């Protein structure tokens, strides 16, 4: 899908670049595949702000997307491609041969009328088909990759995202992720062929603050413009640099400080995303 620019009849339209969604379905989602979604405004069950700068935004309905794809060996037909306000990618409504319906992540080049299938055996290597990594040809572009068999896809799910299967080793598959990381995933984990739809999402320009507010994002206030009571970087006469290495409002290092501490899965990472690109 192409990008849309606008004749600047207002100041906000001068910079505005959005994705042309004219080819997407214009109706409402399937009611049996949706749930209500209440607005939290960044608050937890005690009413305290636990995530800053969230609140407002348009009301949403949550679409139940099937990330597990465990309805094996039943062919499904793509009914339509839909917009989903809860994610950056588009979703596809599929209807199985037995009459069941489901939403799946729409990969690039998937269109209404296409057939998709999920299997525990090898199937055709075409966008939307799901099978275990042990049967996918090396070099394939994949998305919605499981990290534990049966848990559902967790890797490469956002707009334009993908991973590449670069090898196999003793029952494990070696994946190269967009971040540059190379990691091992068990060969029985499922993955779907293709890259995720809406790759132009990274090129959009909101043009005005209000468009972020429609999404429920409030202005992100920098610590350096606060008072000392509000932030470690606050205070000072005139503009200051903060006077110390960047920290959170609670004094913990931020902006690049590594926080990963799951040593049990370190052995699954063959090449860190932090290693210098060669």
From Swiss-Prot:
Gene Ontology biological-process entries: cytoplasmic translation
Pfam families the record matches: Ribosomal_L2, Ribosomal_L2_C
GO cellular component assignments: large ribosomal subunit
Protein's UniProt keywords contain Acetylation: no
Assigned keywords, A-Z: Ribonucleoprotein, Ribosomal protein, RNA-binding, rRNA-binding
Molecular function terms, GO-annotated: rRNA binding; structural constituent of ribosome; transferase activity
InterPro entries: NA-bd_OB-fold (IPR012340), Rib_uL2_dom2 (IPR014722), Ribosomal_uL2 (IPR002171), Ribosomal_uL2_bac/org-type (IPR005880), Ribosomal_uL2_C (IPR022669), Ribosomal_uL2_CS (IPR022671), Ribosomal_uL2_dom3 (IPR014726), Ribosomal_uL2_RNA-bd_dom (IPR022666)
Annotated PROSITE patterns: RIBOSOMAL_L2
Stretch list, region Disordered: 201-278
Biased composition (Basic residues): 210-221
Family: Belongs to the universal ribosomal protein uL2 family.
Biological role stated in the UniProt entry: One of the primary rRNA binding proteins. Required for association of the 30S and 50S subunits to form the 70S ribosome, for tRNA binding and peptide bond formation. It has been suggested to have peptidyltransferase activity; this is somewhat controversial. Makes several contacts with the 16S rRNA in the 70S ribosome.
Subunit structure: Part of the 50S ribosomal subunit. Forms a bridge to the 30S subunit in the 70S ribosome.
Record-linked NCBIfam families: rplB_bact
Protein name: Large ribosomal subunit protein uL2
Gene that specifies this protein: rplB
